[in-house]
């Protein structure tokens, strides 16, 4: 009898993607984060769907509807905290996934890498519009400040901001459309994930050694399905600990105050996963310059395949670039810390130094270290 999974039109696709997929035999746990991101996306869509059943996207009732979910809906508090902290877990996995891609040279698979950048931007957009929905103080002022950045665009800026707001300030129209965006974007992300996987399976996975692994492949199932299962269990355990014991540790206390357009919070700041980009934005005194730096802080990832001149794949045998890479990671952590600090000396100065370092490492130091290492190989 023919094996159904190999011949059925639909199951055949699943089989080639998750069961009989030829995978390098030496990929480490750093390759687990792709599947963990898939699990995070599923958790977010499911919890989000149940939240959307009880949420109302109206300025007068949005805050109360979130309180109602936590108080009156069966396990509503759990669904809400799983969704809020699930976003944090999503971004932790996302940052590690991108960091692994840079370290092991996965950016040489340029189609997969570029779709990944689009996915990163779409996920950031989804998280931003989602943060506005509870309609607390930080939700309202975060939306006001970030959308207002578009007014820096010459000629059409002010009109564009009013068009996005649906009026002359962040109000009911803004909240309604942000809810619509927040509902549809995860499904767009899901479609992009399929394209991401399609491109990845065209070329095959990268591996820690950076060498061609065509001669040494093993089937994805059962080897990597069980390896991924361990990662998934650890992720779920971390998420449950976060949601049950420390549900508000990554949130902002100001968001437990209903939105008030007449009262500005002392320090307006986004969620922790945007702080690095927010620090880069704040470090430039000019509004348009800050917006451009903010956009470039993400889009600069697209330059990795272009600026890579190394004759070796990945950083595993390249100590100079390895050192620069870890300085880059430390610099990112400094930017994240600075983004959450008030705009005052010495934080502004540290932020400016860290922002310059961020771009200098990628555009100047990494290509130079590539050239040095290429010359060392020739010796």
UniProtKB/Swiss-Prot annotation:
UniProt cofactor note: Binds 2 heme b groups non-covalently.
Binding site for a ubiquinone: 201
Highest taxon in the source lineage: Eukaryota
Residues engaged in binding heme b b566: 97, 196
Cofactors, names only: heme b
Positions in coiled-coil regions: none
Secreted in keyword set: no
Name this protein carries in UniProt: Cytochrome b
């Amino acid at each position: 009898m023919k094996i159904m999974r190999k011949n059925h039109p639909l199951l055949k696709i699943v089989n080639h993607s998750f069961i009989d997929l030829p995978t390098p035999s030496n990929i480490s746990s750093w390759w687990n984060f792709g599947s963990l991101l898939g699990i995070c996306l599923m958790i977010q869509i499911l919890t989000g769907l149940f939240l959307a059943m009880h949420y109302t996207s109206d300025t007068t009732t949005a805050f109360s509807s979130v309180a109602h979910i936590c108080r009156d809906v069966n396990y509503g508090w759990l669904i809400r905290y799983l969704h809020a902290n699930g976003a944090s877990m999503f971004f932790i996995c996302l940052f590690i996934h991108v960091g692994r891609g840079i370290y092991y040279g996965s950016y040489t698979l340029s189609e997969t890498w570029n779709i990944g950048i689009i996915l990163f931007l779409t996920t950031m957009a989804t998280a931003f519009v989602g943060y506005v929905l509870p309609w607390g103080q930080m939700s309202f002022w975060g939306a006001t400040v970030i959308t207002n950045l578009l007014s820096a665009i010459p000629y059409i800026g002010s009109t564009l901001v009013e068009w996005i707001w649906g009026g002359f300030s962040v109000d009911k129209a803004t909240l309604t459309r942000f809810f619509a965006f927040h509902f549809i974007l995860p499904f767009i992300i899901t479609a992009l994930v399929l394209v991401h996987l399609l491109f990845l399976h065209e070329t095959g996975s990268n591996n820690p050694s950076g060498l061609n692994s065509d001669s040494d492949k093993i089937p994805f199932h059962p080897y990597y399905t069980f390896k991924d299962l361990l990662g998934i269990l650890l992720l779920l355990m971390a998420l449950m600990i976060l949601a049950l014991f420390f549900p508000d540790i990554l949130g902002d206390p100001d968001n437990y105050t209903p939105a008030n357009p007449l009262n500005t919070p002392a320090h307006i700041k986004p969620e922790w996963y945007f702080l690095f980009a927010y620090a880069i934005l704040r470090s430039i005194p000019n509004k348009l310059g800050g917006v451009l730096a903010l956009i470039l802080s993400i889009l600069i990832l697209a330059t990795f395949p272009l600026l890579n001149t190394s004759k070796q794949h990945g950083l595993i045998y390249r100590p100079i670039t390895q050192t620069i890479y870890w300085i880059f990671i430390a610099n990112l952590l400094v930017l994240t810390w600075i983004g959450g600090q008030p705009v005052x000396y010495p934080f502004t100065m540290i932020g400016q130094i860290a922002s310059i370092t961020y771009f200098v490492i990628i555009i100047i130091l990494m290509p130079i270290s590539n050239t040095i290492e290429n010359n060392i190989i020739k010796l």
